[in-house]
C-alpha cells in the first residue's frame, strides 16, 4: 500500500510538471527571426522547449522567482533577455554562463537583495544592463562590472534600500553613454566613487535630499557631459565653496527634473552652476518654484552669472505664489548672452519690455502653451525688444487676431520664423503687416476657413494644415514648402501660383484624383505627400499611378497611404494593387460597339421585316387587337348574313347581276353582305369590314387579277386571314372568276394559300351549260 501511494504521488508530480511546461510553451510566441515574446503570460519558470535559434526573449511581468544554472544553458545565441517585474529572488552563480553573445539584460524591479559579480563575468558582449528597483543595499562585495568592457548603458539603485555607493562599485568602467543611479535614499558616498568613470555622456541621478549632492558633483565635473538631477528637494540647498582642483568642466548641459526649489536655493544653485566653466544649456522640467521671483539671496547679493549658458529651457514650471511673482528684474544682467529660451506650459502671459530689451543675443524664443494675448504681446515685443530674434514660437496661446499679431511683431526686424499654430483665429483679413524678413509661417490648427493676401509674399515655408480650407489660390512666388494636410481641398493647388515649390504635403483632404499633367506643371517639385485622400480609382488615374515608376520617388507615402474610395468593389484597397476590367476601362468604346451592333441588328430586322412583310403583320395584328377590344352590344355574336362578298369594283357587274340574282332570289334566299349596299355610312371602312366579316357565316372571295390589285380587297383578305387564325375555321370560300396563278396571292396570306393548296375552290366556267352546276356548288358551300 505505501509503495502504491508513493507511485501515485510521483506520477502526480510528473503530470503537474508536464502541464506547467505545456502552459509555459503556450504563453510564448516566436517569429522567424528568433524573437520570442512571453510578457504577462503567468509563467512560473523560464521555458525549456525553445531552440538555440532564439535571439530575443521577453519574459517580463510573469511569476518567475528562481533562475537555475540550466534554465538558459541552451540559448547560446541569445542577444536580448528581459526579465523585469517578475519577483526573481535567486539567480544561481552560473545561470548566464552560456550567454556570451548577450547584449541586452534587464533584471529591473525584482527581489534581488544581493548582486553577484559571477553573474556578469561571462557576458563579454553586454551593452545594456538594468538593475533598477531591486532591494539591494550596495552593489556587491566586489566590483560587478569590471569585466563588462562593452557596456554602454547602466541603470542601478532603488528608491528605498540602496544607501551606499563605494569606490569599487564602478571600477573598470571607462566609457558609458548613459548611467542612471537611483540614490533616492543614499546615506553614504565614498569620495571618488564615480570619478573612476572617465566619460559619461548622460548621467541621471535620483536623490530625494541634497545632503551628498556636492560631494557627488565634485567627482562628476570632469567626466559627465549631460547631468540630470531628478526628484530632489532643493528648498534648503546651500552652496559651499568646492575644492575640486579642476579648472575645466566637461558638463555642457544641466537638467533639473521634478525638483523643488525656492528663491534662495535657486540663488545657491546659480553659485553651483558658476563653477561649471563649460556649461551651455540649462533645463528645468516639471519643477516647483516656491518663491516670488526675488533671486538676490539672503544677503541681497547680486545673482551669480552662470557663465556661458546659451540655452535655457523651462517646461511645466509650477509656481504656487504665481500672482505674487516679481518682475524678474534681478535676472536682467544674466540674460544678455542667452541665445535660446523655451518657456513652455508655465502660465506665462507677459514678458516685461525691459527683460525683452536685455535679451540682446536671443535668436530663438518658444512660449508655447501659455497665456499670451495680443495686448500683452505688444508690451513684450516693444521697441528694441529681442533685437536678434529670428524664431518666435507662440503655439497654443490665446491669440485671436491675425492682423493684430502681425502688426505687433513689426518691431522684430530680424524675425524670419513664426509659429502661431493652435491659436484660434477663424477669420483672416485681406491684408496684414508682417516683419519684412519673414520666411516661415505656421498657421496650422487655427480654424481658419480661407486664405487671403494676408499671407506674406516673402514666405519660403507655409504650414496651414488642419484647418477648414476648401481652396488655395494664393500667389507665393518664393514658396518652397507647402504643408496643407487635413483640410477640405478637392484638387491640387495651381502650379503657376507656386513656381518655386519643392515640397507639397496635402494628405487627408478630399482630393479624388490628380493627373500627370498636374504633377508635370510643378516643374521644381521633389516631394509630394498626398495619401489619405478619397481617391476615385478610375482607369486614367490607375494607369497614371501604376505606370509612372518615377512617381514613387516623388510620393513619399506611396503606396501604403493611397487607398481607393470608389468604385465600391475596390474600396479600401491600395491604388497600386487595383486592377479594373476591360469593360470598366474602355466603357466608351464598349458602348460605341454595342450601339453599332444594335444599329446593325435593327437594320437587319428592318430588311427582314420588309422582305417578309413584318410591318404589315404588326399593323394587322394591332388593328385586329383594337377591334377585339371594342365593347360589344351583345354578349353573343349575331350572324346577320350568310356570306360577306369580297370583290373588286371592276368585277361588280358579275357580282351584282349574276351572283346576287342567283343567291338572293333563290328559295330559300341567301342574304349577302355587299360593301356598296350594306356598309354603314359614316363608319370607318376598316370597322365596316371587320363587323361585316364577323356578322357573316362565310366570306366569299371573288378572285381575279383585279382583286389582287385592289387595296381594299387586300384589307378584306387581311381580316379574313386573322379570323381564320382566331376562330380556327374554314369560313373562306374562294371563287376564281378568271384563271389566276396561286403565286399572284401575296406570301403573307399563308393561310389562304394553304387553303388553295389543300381544298378545292370554285372556278367560274365560261361554258353556260356548266354554270348551273357552279351555282349549286356555291350554295352548298355557303350552307356548310
Swiss-Prot record:
Organism from which the protein derives: Macaca fascicularis (Crab-eating macaque)
SUPFAM superfamilies for this protein: L domain-like (SSF52058), RNI-like (SSF52047), Toll/Interleukin receptor TIR domain (SSF52200)
Subunit structure, interactors included: Interacts with LY96, TLR1 and TLR6 (via extracellular domain). TLR2 seems to exist in heterodimers with either TLR1 or TLR6 before stimulation by the ligand. The heterodimers form bigger oligomers in response to their corresponding ligands as well as further heterotypic associations with other receptors such as CD14 and/or CD36. Binds MYD88 (via TIR domain). Interacts with TICAM1. Interacts with CNPY3. Interacts with ATG16L1. Interacts with PPP1R11. Interacts with TICAM2. Interacts with TIRAP.
Alphabetized InterPro entries for the sequence: Cys-rich_flank_reg_C (IPR000483), Leu-rich_rpt (IPR001611), Leu-rich_rpt_typical-subtyp (IPR003591), LRR_dom_sf (IPR032675), TIR_dom (IPR000157), Toll-like_receptor (IPR017241), Toll_tir_struct_dom_sf (IPR035897)
Ranges for domain LRRCT: 525-579
Residues exposed to the Extracellular side: 19-587
LRR repeat copies, ranges: 54-77, 78-101, 102-125, 126-150, 151-175, 176-199, 200-223, 224-250, 251-278, 279-308, 309-337, 338-361, 362-388, 389-414, 415-437, 438-457, 458-478, 479-500, 501-524
Main location: membrane
Family (UniProt): Belongs to the Toll-like receptor family.
Locus of motif ATG16L1-binding motif: 761-778
Gene3D superfamilies: Ribonuclease Inhibitor, Toll/interleukin-1 receptor homology (TIR) domain
Name of the protein this chain belongs to: Toll-like receptor 2
GO cellular component, one term: phagocytic vesicle membrane
Posttranslational mods: Ubiquitinated at Lys-754 by PPP1R11, leading to its degradation. Deubiquitinated by USP2.
Comment text on domains: Ester-bound lipid substrates are bound through a crevice formed between the LRR 11 and LRR 12. The ATG16L1-binding motif mediates interaction with ATG16L1.
Cytoplasmic-facing ranges: 609-784
Boundaries of every TIR domain copy: 639-782
Keywords: Cytoplasmic vesicle, Disulfide bond, Glycoprotein, Immunity, Inflammatory response, Innate immunity, Isopeptide bond, Leucine-rich repeat, Membrane, NAD, Receptor, Repeat, Signal, Transmembrane, Transmembrane helix, Ubl conjugation
Site entry: Interaction with bacterial lipopeptide: 349
Membrane topology of this protein: Single-pass type I membrane protein
Signal peptide: 1-18
Disulfide bonds: 30-36, 353-382, 432-454
GO biological process: cellular response to diacyl bacterial lipopeptide; cellular response to triacyl bacterial lipopeptide; inflammatory response; innate immune response; toll-like receptor signaling pathway
Glycosylated position list: 114, 199, 414, 442
Amino acid at each position: 500500500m505505501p509503495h502504491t501511494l508513493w507511485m501515485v504521488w510521483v506520477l502526480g508530480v510528473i503530470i503537474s510538471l508536464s502541464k506547467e511546461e505545456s502552459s509555459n510553451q503556450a504563453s510564448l510566441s516566436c517569429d522567424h527571426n528568433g524573437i520570442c515574446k512571453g510578457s504577462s503570460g503567468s509563467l512560473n519558470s523560464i521555458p525549456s522547449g525553445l531552440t538555440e535559434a532564439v535571439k530575443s526573449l521577453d519574459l517580463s511581468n510573469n511569476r518567475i522567482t528562481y533562475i537555475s544554472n540550466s534554465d538558459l544553458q541552451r540559448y547560446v545565441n541569445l542577444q536580448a533577455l528581459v526579465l523585469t517585474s517578475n519577483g526573481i529572488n535567486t539567480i544561481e552563480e552560473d545561470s548566464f554562463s552560456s550567454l556570451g553573445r548577450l547584449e541586452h539584460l534587464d533584471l529591473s524591479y525584482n527581489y534581488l537583495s544581493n548582486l553577484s559579480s559571477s553573474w556578469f563575468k561571462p557576458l563579454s558582449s553586454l551593452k545594456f544592463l538594468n538593475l533598477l528597483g531591486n532591494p539591494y543595499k550596495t552593489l556587491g562585495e566586489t566590483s560587478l562590472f569590471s569585466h563588462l568592457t562593452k557596456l554602454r548603458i547602466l541603470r542601478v539603485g532603488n528608491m528605498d534600500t540602496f544607501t551606499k555607493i563605494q569606490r569599487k562599485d564602478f571600477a573598470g568602467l571607462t566609457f558609458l553613454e548613459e548611467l542612471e543611479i537611483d540614490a533616492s535614499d543614499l546615506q553614504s558616498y565614498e569620495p571618488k566613487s564615480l570619478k573612476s568613470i572617465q566619460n559619461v555622456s548622460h548621467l541621471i541621478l535620483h536623490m530625494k535630499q541634497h545632503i551628498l549632492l556636492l560631494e557627488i558633483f565634485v567627482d562628476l565635473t570632469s567626466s559627465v557631459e549631460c547631468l540630470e538631477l531628478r526628484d530632489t528637494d532643493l528648498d534648503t540647498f546651500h552652496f559651499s565653496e568646492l575644492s575640486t582642483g579642476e579648472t575645466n568642466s566637461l558638463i555642457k548641459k544641466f537638467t533639473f527634473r521634478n525638483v523643488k526649489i525656492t528663491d534662495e536655493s535657486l540663488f545657491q544653485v546659480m553659485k553651483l552652476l558658476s563653477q561649471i566653466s563649460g556649461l551651455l544649456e540649462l533645463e528645468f522640467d516639471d519643477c516647483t518654484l516656491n518663491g516670488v521671483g526675488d533671486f538676490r539671496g539672503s544677503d541681497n547679493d547680486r545673482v551669480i552669472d552662470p557663465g556661458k549658458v546659451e540655452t535655457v529651457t523651462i517646461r511645466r514650471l509650477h509656481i504656487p505664489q504665481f500672482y505674487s511673482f516679481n518682475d524678474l528684474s534681478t535676472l536682467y544682467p544674466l540674460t544678455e548672452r542667452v541665445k535660446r529660451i523655451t518657456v513652455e506650459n508655465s502660465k506665462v502671459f507677459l514678458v516685461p519690455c525691459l527683460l525683452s530689451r536685455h535679451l540682446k543675443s536671443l535668436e530663438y524664443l518658444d512660449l508655447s502653451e501659455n497665456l499670451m494675448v495680443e495686448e500683452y504681446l505688444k508690451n513684450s515685443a516693444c521697441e528694441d525688444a529681442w533685437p536678434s530674434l529670428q524664431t518666435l514660437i507662440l503655439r497654443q496661446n490665446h491669440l485671436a487676431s491675425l492682423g493684430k499679431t502681425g502688426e505687433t511683431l513689426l518691431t522684430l526686424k530680424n524675425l524670419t520664423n513664426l509659429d502661431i499654430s493652435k491659436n484660434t483665429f477663424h477669420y483672416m483679413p485681406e491684408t496684414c503687416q508682417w516683419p519684412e524678413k519673414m520666411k516661415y509661417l505656421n498657421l496650422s490648427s487655427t480654424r481658419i476657413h480661407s486664405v487671403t493676401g494676408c499671407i506674406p509674399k516673402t514666405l519660403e515655408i507655409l504650414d496651414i494644415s488642419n484647418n477648414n480650407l476648401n481652396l488655395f489660390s494664393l500667389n507665393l512666388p518664393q514658396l518652397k514648402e507647402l504643408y496643407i494636410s487635413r483640410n477640405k481641398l478637392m484638387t491640387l493647388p495651381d502650379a503657376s501660383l507656386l513656381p518655386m515649390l519643392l515640397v507639397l504635403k496635402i494628405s487627408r483632404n478630399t482630393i479624388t484624383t490628380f493627373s500627370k499633367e498636374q504633377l508635370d506643371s510643378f516643374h521644381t517639385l521633389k516631394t509630394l505627400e498626398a495619401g489619405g485622400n478619397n481617391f476615385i480609382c478610375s482607369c486614367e488615374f490607375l494607369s497614371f499611378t501604376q505606370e509612372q515608376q518615377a512617381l514613387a520617388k516623388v510620393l513619399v507615402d506611396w503606396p501604403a497611404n493611397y487607398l481607393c474610395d470608389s468604385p465600391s468593389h475596390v474600396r479600401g484597397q491600395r491604388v497600386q494593387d487595383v486592377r479594373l476590367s476591360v469593360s470598366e476601362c474602355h466603357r466608351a468604346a464598349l458602348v460605341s460597339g454595342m450601339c453599332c451592333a444594335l444599329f446593325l441588328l435593327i437594320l437587319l430586322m428592318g430588311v427582314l421585316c420588309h422582305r417578309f412583310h413584318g410591318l404589315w403583320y404588326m399593323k394587322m395584328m394591332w388593328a385586329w387587337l383594337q377591334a377585339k377590344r371594342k365593347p360589344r352590344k351583345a354578349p353573343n355574336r349575331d350572324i346577320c348574313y350568310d356570306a360577306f362578298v369580297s370583290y373588286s369594283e371592276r368585277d361588280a357587274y358579275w357580282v351584282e347581276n349574276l351572283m346576287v340574282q342567283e343567291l338572293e332570289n333563290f328559295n330559300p334566299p341567301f342574304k349577302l353582305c355587299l360593301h356598296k349596299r350594306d356598309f354603314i355610312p359614316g363608319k370607318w371602312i376598316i370597322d365596316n369590314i371587320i363587323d361585316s366579316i364577323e356578322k357573316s357565316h362565310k366570306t366569299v372571295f371573288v378572285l381575279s387579277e383585279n382583286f389582287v390589285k385592289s387595296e381594299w380587297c387586300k384589307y378584306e383578305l387581311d381580316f379574313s386571314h386573322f379570323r381564320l387564325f382566331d376562330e380556327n375555321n374554314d369560313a373562306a370560300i374562294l371563287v376564281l372568276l378568271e384563271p389566276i396563278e396561286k403565286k399572284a396571292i401575296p406570301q403573307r396570306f399563308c393561310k389562304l394559300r394553304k387553303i388553295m393548296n389543300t381544298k378545292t375552290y370554285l372556278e367560274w366556267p365560261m361554258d353556260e351549260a356548266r354554270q348551273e352546276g357552279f351555282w349549286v356548288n356555291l350554295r352548298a358551300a355557303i350552307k356548310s
